């Protein structure tokens, strides 16, 4: 089974999420860091590698919270949440041409179709609401 993973980075100091603008080859849509898990990698190892490739960043003390596991035929996509103290400036690779930190429910447009579906899934919204309410107490 093919697996991919993505991550919502949330800055506790600004209460904003990181989104990445994919390049022309990737349809100029906004998404989150992540990508394909390679053979021999664990889910977390693959997600860490993808973040370092795409952002040159992955927090050493990351506490990853699973948000969603989506299965479609021979493909599984895992979505995680990670609260960090402060925003950072990502050093983007050639897959992306921009980034933006935006507030909850203030998504940049157009969203990648897969991320659009994830964000609009009620269970995902409820999990994010619960996580944010715990953090913001």
Feature names for model-found ranges:
Residues 25-28:
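A conserved beta-turn-beta hairpin within the catalytic core of GNAT-like acetyltransferases
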Residues 31-32:
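A short gly/proline-enriched turn/hairpin at secondary-structure junctions
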Residues 1-18:
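Conserved N-terminal beta-strand and adjoining loop/helix that marks the start
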Residues 21-22, 69:
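Short beta-strand
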Residues 1, 136-137:
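Short intrinsically disordered terminal tails
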Residues 35-124, 135-136:
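Unchanged
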Residues 10-12, 22-23, 83:
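A generic structural motif
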Residues 14-21, 87-92:
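Short, well-ordered strand-loop elements centered on a beta-strand within folded domains, enriched
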């Amino acid at each position: 089974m093919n697996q991919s993973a993505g991550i919502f980075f949330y800055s506790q100091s600004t209460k904003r999420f990181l989104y990445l603008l994919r390049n022309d080859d990737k349809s100029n849509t906004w998404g989150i860091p992540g990508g394909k898990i390679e053979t021999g990698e664990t889910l977390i190892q693959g997600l860490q590698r993808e973040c370092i490739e795409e952002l040159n960043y992955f927090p050493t003390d990351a506490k990853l919270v699973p948000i969603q596991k989506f299965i479609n035929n021979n493909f599984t996509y895992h979505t995680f949440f990670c609260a960090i103290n402060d925003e950072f400036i990502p050093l983007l690779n050639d897959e992306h041409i921009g980034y933006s930190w935006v507030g909850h429910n203030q998504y940049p447009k157009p969203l990648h179709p897969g991320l659009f579906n994830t964000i609009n899934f009620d269970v995902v919204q409820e999990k994010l609401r619960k996580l944010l309410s715990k953090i913001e107490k």
